[in-house]
Amino acid sequence: MPNTQSPYIAFAMLLSSNGHPVTPAELHGLLIGRSCAGAGFDADAWLADAAQLLETEPGDTVRNALVGLQEMVKAELTGEDVAIVLLLPSDDAALADRAAALGQWCQGFITGFGLNAGGKDLSTDAKEVLQDLVAISQVQEALEESEDGENDYMEVMEYLRVAPLLLYTELAKPEAPATKPSLH
C-alpha cells in the first residue's frame, strides 16, 4: 500500500484538489529541465511555465508549493551534492505507478528544457543525455513487476539523479554577482 504521507502523494493531492491535471513528477521534471537549460531561478518565470502545464493560474497554496519546490531544486543544483532528489512515488508504490511517474518526469524535463534551451549548442554528452531522457519517457510500460524490473527501475532512477547535472553544468547561467557599491 502506498505511503499516503509521502511528499509525492501530498503534492499530488494538493494539485488534484485544486483542479490541476498534472502529476508532481511531470511538474518536477519541468522545473529541473528548465533550470538545466539555463532559465535561472526567477520565481515569476517558473510560475509562468508551471501555469502552462497546470492549464490554469495556480492559487496561493499551489503557488507557494511551487516556489518551495523551486527553492529546493535551486539548492540541489547549486549545492555541493552530485545528485538531485527526484519527486517520484515512494518505493512501496506499485512498480507500474513508479515507472509511469518516471516517464512523466522525463516528459516534463524534456518540455522544460525545450522551452528554455533556445537552440543552444550542446556537447555530444549533453545530446546523449537528452536522447536517453526521450527513450526513458517512452519505455515505462516495459518494466515488469519482478526483481529484474525493480532493478531496472532503480538503475534508471539513479541515472536520472545525476544525468541532469551534466546539462546544468554545461548550460545554466551563473547567478549574477551582486553589484558592490563603489566609492567615488
UniProtKB/Swiss-Prot annotation:
Output the Gene Ontology cellular-component terms. Answer: cytosol
Tell me one Pfam family matched here: UPF0149
Q: Which InterPro entries match?
A: YgfB-like (IPR011978), YgfB-like_sf (IPR036255)
Which NCBIfam families does the annotation name?
Answer: PRK02166.1
- Which family does the record assign? Belongs to the UPF0149 family.
Q: What HAMAP family has UniProt attached to this entry? A: UPF0149
Name the UniProt record assigns to this protein? UPF0149 protein PSEEN5316
Tell me which species this is from.
Pseudomonas entomophila (strain L48)
Upper classification of the source organism reads: Bacteria, Pseudomonadati, Pseudomonadota, Gammaproteobacteria, Pseudomonadales
